[in-house]
Amino acid sequence: LTLMAFVTVIGFDDIMYNFQNQGMTVITSWILMLFLYVIPYSLMVGHLGSVFNHEGGGLSSWIRGTKGEFLGYFTAWTYWAASVPYVVDSANSVVVGFGWAFTGSNKFQDTMSNASFTFWTFVTFVIFIFIQHHLKNSMEILSTIGGGMMFIMTILFVLLAFFGLAKSGGHMATQPMTWHTIIPKFDLKYWSTVGMLIYAVNGCELIAPYVTQMKNPRREFPKAMIALSVMTAFLTIFGSFALGIYFNAYHLPNDLKMNGSYYAFSALGKQFGVGNLFMYIYAWTSVLYMCALLAVLLDAMTRMLISDTGEKYMPKFLRKTNKDGLPINGYLLTCGLSAFIML
């Protein structure tokens, strides 16, 4: 469950996005965010998940149980609709990841027309719905493999980056590197980027619908949230510093948000004399990770919408599930709306 939550909450690309926005000052921002948001929010989710451990709607079940059925229904629809663009973005990232995994560069997506990119993104949706429908426990398998590999690759990047820093005599691409480099200037520009930090580490409530599948949810679910907080702290703080070793935070590439993760592992491999080996390993890791994220998002947001919403608010055909308890018609609704957004 911790790896499923890790998949929805944080990834290497989330670190890259905010490094692009704030540079090395993002280290301080991550520390503040951990204590002011990540840890308290994870503990709240852990507590609510352990209390409402027999309901399968997650956030919508919590609101329904505390504020009434209508607000529970309103929460379910609102959260589902707000998550659809994120699902589309995750499917896009799967296509980008395959491009890097096969070509070792960004040529695949750069030479593709918008229509072709949209087509392959839609194909990704169809494949995932087919897999979810026919392969039992596919989401759990993808989450374990994708989340585990991404965490391992992050640890590998951080450890090798610090080893490379010592090997090079302390030379960093970010110069000058002083205490002032990591202290943000709390102006309007800074505050306008804080929302991206929250967006990056948000999402642990998505795995709440699976609390009903745990053997001892009252004890195990809070533990999963605590483990998630520790993993997030390591990835955000040390990962951001490691990026400053290979990228000059004062002069960053324009396409860092889309391709920065691949540039980082390529630079790491070249420093250690293995060429693009690390980059290719990361590319396939990213594909598995984004596939896991897409699977969890499709399933969790649909369950949140359908699993514990009052019958008078939810049409019967949407509440229909297959023999494994999967809301297939809900998947199709999500896929249809995603296709509309892409078009």
Question: What are the residue ranges of the model-derived segments?
Answer:
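Membrane-water interface regions at transmembrane-helix termini and the short interhelical loops
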Residues: 17, 21, 50, 123-149, ...
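Helix-loop-helix connectors at the membrane interface of multi-pass transporters/channels
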Residues: 61-64, 91-117, 153, 214-217, ...
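Transmembrane alpha-helical segments of multi-pass small-molecule transport proteins
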Residues: 1-6, 103-137, 151-160, 197-202, ...
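Flexible loop linkers connecting adjacent transmembrane helices
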Residues: 23-27, 45-73, 98-109, 133-136, ...
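Transmembrane helix-boundary motif of multi-pass solute transporters/channels
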Residues: 1-96, 206-207, 214, 225
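TM-loop-TM module centered on a large, flexible mid-protein loop between adjacent transmembrane helices
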Residues: 60-62, 68, 227-294, 314-343
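Hydrophobic alpha-helical transmembrane segments of multi-pass membrane proteins
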Residues: 32-36, 77-85, 126-130, 190-198, ...
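Helix-loop-helix junctions that connect adjacent transmembrane segments
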Residues: 28, 111-115, 144-280
